[in-house]
Amino acid sequence: MEDLLNNAKQHLCMRNPKLIRIGLRQVESIVYHVAKPSHDDKIPREIFLKLQDSPLYNSTTPCIYALDSLLEYQQNEEAYEKNFQFIQKLIDDLLHVIEGLVLIHPKSQTLFEDKATLRLFIHLLQPSQPSMLQVAAMKTLVCIMADRPLAIRLFEQINGLQQICVVFKHKQTSQDTRFQILEFFYFYLSPEPYSIDVIAYRKTRTEKQAYLSKYLSNVQGLRDDLDKFQPFGKLDETFD
């Protein structure tokens, strides 16, 4: 498995989108087999998870590098115009793979506790980006921020919440994107975990409501809906 992961990493770290796709397909295949193991499965989950603990074989890091490369490619208008459908689909697939990786290996969430990495999502949350990528970016953000108050605080510091509100209020924003942003708001307004590891970064629901209210009206209404419908299950407000 080390060879498989290393080969995928080499492709993902190339600046060529076609080579990135090869690496992505390799990681995608591994994640699929790990997430849905069968009796004759050749990729034991335990081995994969142990390898993901190693910086040498972790698959999330090269995926982040690939995302940076593809977003840079988007800035090259001439090249992007010729391949925009291919690049958009590749970015979308890449975000889905990142989701899978952090869900299977939650320790990889810590790789996103970095402002430069989180800024990649700011690029994806521009009104000019296609709805498909905006939606995928919002879903991925929830996965990488779940139970990670530090990542949420860093995203606030780079004006990530403000940018999400800009997209939410933009006239041309699709209903799909708005729906996904609403789901993110509910996630954001939910209680954060309380433990010695995260207490220094944790905010209460009231603090987050006040922060979000700087950029969005009727946040109290969102919180009331969250309390009433509890889309993520019963809210633990012990420390709020």
From Swiss-Prot:
BP GO terms, sorted: cell division; regulation of mitotic cytokinesis; septation initiation signaling
Localization in the cell: Cytoplasm, Cytoskeleton, Microtubule organizing center, Spindle pole body
Coiled-coil stretches: none
Keywords (A to Z) from UniProt: Cell cycle, Cell division, Cytoplasm, Cytoskeleton, Mitosis
Protein function: Has a role in the septation initiation network (SIN) required for cytokinesis.
Subunit (UniProt): Interacts with sid1.
UniProt-listed PANTHER family: CELL DIVISION CONTROL PROTEIN 14 (PTHR34065:SF1)
Name of the protein this chain belongs to: Cell division control protein 14
Organism taxonomic ancestry: Eukaryota, Fungi, Dikarya, Ascomycota, Taphrinomycotina
Underlying gene: cdc14
